């Protein structure tokens, strides 16, 4: 807990310093319509597996985990640009550790609501992987200690506070789904369910613009 508090204080002090620097900077605001900027971002926050999880003890849903993400993206204010993102999720379900990964390209639309507030919507399509680590648990087609590969989709929307020309702090809400393909004999679930796993979440984001 002490480390978390110290980290929050450090981030807060950086934000104040960046804001002070921005107010003293008389250069033209780079975040205007038509401007193309590169962004490197890191994010962390809670997430929930919102598809059914079948175990030897019954069905579970909305299982909480932790989401980590890194994204390199172009931001065209008032337009669409592209990027690439990687996300990793860890969820513990009654002793079963489920690891989910996503990597793929994305398209991002950005809109400047105010001189200091930037909105973003992203859509991605890429590779998804899943792995479960407990021999008595399964999540749909997730096999124990075996990495499952599938088609991953990502939809995200967020808001960014532009602390300076190069620093931003934001909040993202996202939905990710991994489709594993055709069902087989190892599938756990109802006949009308897809063979896949989905999760929703919210993350705090640190942006570096250049």
Annotate each language-model stretch with its function.
Residues 54-56, 96, 133-135, 183-185:
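Outer-membrane beta-barrel and related beta-rich outer-membrane complex signature
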């Amino acid at each position: 807990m002490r480390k978390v508090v110290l980290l929050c204080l450090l981030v807060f002090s950086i934000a104040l310093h960046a804001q002070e620097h921005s107010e003293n900077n008389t250069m033209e605001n780079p975040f205007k319509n038509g401007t193309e900027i590169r962004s490197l971002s890191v994010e962390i926050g809670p997430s929930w597996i919102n598809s059914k999880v079948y175990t030897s003890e019954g069905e579970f849903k909305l299982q909480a985990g932790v989401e980590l993400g890194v994204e390199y993206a172009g931001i065209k204010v008032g337009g669409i640009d592209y990027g690439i993102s990687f996300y990793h999720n860890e969820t513990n379900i009654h002793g079963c550790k489920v690891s989910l990964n996503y990597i793929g390209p994305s398209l991002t639309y950005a809109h400047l609501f105010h001189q200091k507030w930037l909105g973003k919507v992203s859509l991605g399509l890429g590779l998804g992987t899943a792995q479960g680590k407990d021999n008595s648990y399964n999540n749909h087609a997730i096999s124990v200690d075996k990495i499952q590969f599938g088609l991953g989709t990502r939809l995200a929307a967020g808001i960014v506070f532009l602390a300076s020309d190069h620093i931003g702090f934001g909040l993202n809400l996202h939905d990710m789904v991994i489709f594993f393909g055709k069902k087989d004999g190892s599938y756990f679930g109802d006949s009308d369910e897809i063979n896949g796993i989905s999760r929703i979440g919210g993350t705090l984001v640190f942006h570096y613009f250049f």
